[in-house]
C-alpha cells in the first residue's frame, strides 16, 4: 500500500460529505467537490479520513495515495486557503488588480489583462507584487503559471514575472 495513502487526513474543522462518486469538503472559506475514484474506499473515522485500496493491484495502491493527497489539499484549502506570490522585475513592469481582472504592463505595446477564474482572487500589495489566493491548490498554481507565462524571467538580465521564491540563474553575455 502507498505510504502516503496509509496516513489519515485530519479534518481540522472541515465537514466531509461522501457519496458513491463524489467527495465534498466544506469549511469556513468555501466548498470543494472532487470526483472519487472507484479503486479507493474512503472511511470517515471520527474527524479523520482513511483511504484504503479496494484490491491489491498496483493501480489501486497508487490511487489511494493520490486521493489522500487531493483530499488533504481540499481540507487545507477550505480551512486555511492557498496563496502564490509573484514578483515583477523590470523597468516599467506593473500590475494592478481590478475586481476579477488583473491588468499587467509587461513591456509589450499593449496592456495584458488576465481574467481570474471563479474562486481565485488576485491582490497587488505593491505595483510589482502579485498575490494569488484561493481554496483550490490546482487552480491557484495554474493561474500563477499563466500569469508568469506572459513574460517568464529571461536568462541574461532576469527581467520578467517570477515566483517570489524563484532563483533565476543569470547567464554571462558573450565577450568579444
From Swiss-Prot:
A Pfam family it matches: Ribosomal_L6
Keyword Plastid: no
Keyword Ribosomal protein: yes
Keywords (A to Z) from UniProt: Ribonucleoprotein, Ribosomal protein, RNA-binding, rRNA-binding
One function term, GO molecular function aspect: rRNA binding
Biological process, per Gene Ontology: cytoplasmic translation
GO cellular component: cytosolic large ribosomal subunit
Domain of life per record: Bacteria
Role, per record: This protein binds to the 23S rRNA, and is important in its secondary structure. It is located near the subunit interface in the base of the L7/L12 stalk, and near the tRNA binding site of the peptidyltransferase center.
Description of how the protein assembles with itself and partners: Part of the 50S ribosomal subunit.
Family to which the UniProt record says this protein belongs: Belongs to the universal ribosomal protein uL6 family.
UniProt-recorded name of the protein: Large ribosomal subunit protein uL6
Organism: Paraburkholderia phytofirmans (strain DSM 17436 / LMG 22146 / PsJN)
Organism lineage: Bacteria, Pseudomonadati, Pseudomonadota, Betaproteobacteria, Burkholderiales
Amino acid at each position: 500500500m502507498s505510504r502516503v495513502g496509509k496516513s489519515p487526513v485530519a479534518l481540522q474543522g472541515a465537514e466531509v460529505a461522501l457519496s458513491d462518486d463524489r467527495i465534498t469538503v466544506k469549511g469556513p472559506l468555501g466548498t470543494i467537490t472532487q470526483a472519487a475514484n472507484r479503486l479507493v474506499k474512503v472511511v470517515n473515522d471520527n474527524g479523520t479520513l482513511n483511504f484504503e485500496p479496494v484490491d491489491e493491484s498496483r493501480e489501486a495502491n497508487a490511487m489511494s495515495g493520490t486521493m489522500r493527497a487531493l483530499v488533504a489539499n481540499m481540507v487545507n484549502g477550505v480551512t486555511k486557503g492557498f496563496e502564490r506570490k509573484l514578483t515583477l522585475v523590470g523597468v516599467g513592469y506593473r500590475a494592478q488588480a481590478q475586481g476579477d481582472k488583473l491588468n499587467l504592463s509587461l513591456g509589450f505595446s499593449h496592456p495584458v489583462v488576465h481574467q481570474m477564474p471563479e474562486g481565485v482572487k488576485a491582490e497587488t500589495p505593491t505595483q510589482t507584487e502579485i498575490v494569488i489566493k484561493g481554496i483550490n491548490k490546482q487552480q491557484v498554481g495554474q493561474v500563477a503559471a499563466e500569469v508568469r507565462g506572459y513574460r517568464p524571467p529571461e536568462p541574461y538580465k532576469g527581467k520578467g514575472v517570477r515566483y517570489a521564491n524563484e532563483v533565476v540563474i543569470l547567464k554571462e553575455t558573450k565577450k568579444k
